[in-house]
């Protein structure tokens, strides 16, 4: 992660299991497990179940966050995994999520956040 403060993965997950995506407790558990399996330190967890369907949530980790917004009726989930530092690989967390949500297809991209090679920092 040279010259960057963090790595932010954006994932479009298609063909996911609708029953899983609509279960707030299960989505929360999978998200927390993904963070822990990647070696992250979980700080806060907040999830909400929408009516008639859908779940949104965030797992705040010491290294940044994991977020999700689900559309069970479409079998779709929008997932973000953002990690700072070099101790947690966001792809490990994402692989866990994709597997446990049963995604048939994903489109993912990684953005390097806080690219500092041209930044000038003045501390007074």
Predicted region positions:
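Polybasic/polar functional segments that serve as interface/processing modules
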Residues: 1-124
């Amino acid at each position: 992660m040279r010259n960057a403060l963090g790595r932010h993965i954006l994932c479009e997950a298609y063909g996911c299991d609708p029953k899983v995506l609509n279960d707030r407790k299960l989505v929360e558990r999978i998200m927390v497990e993904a963070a822990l399996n990647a070696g992250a330190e979980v700080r806060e967890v907040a999830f909400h179940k929408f009516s008639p369907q859908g779940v949104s949530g965030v797992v705040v980790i010491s290294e940044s966050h994991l977020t999700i917004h689900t559309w069970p009726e479409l079998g779709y989930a929008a997932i973000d995994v953002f990690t700072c530092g070099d101790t947690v690989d966001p792809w490990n967390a994402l692989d866990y999520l994709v597997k446990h949500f049963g995604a048939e297809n994903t489109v993912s991209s990684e953005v390097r956040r806080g690219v500092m090679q041209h930044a000038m920092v003045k501390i007074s």
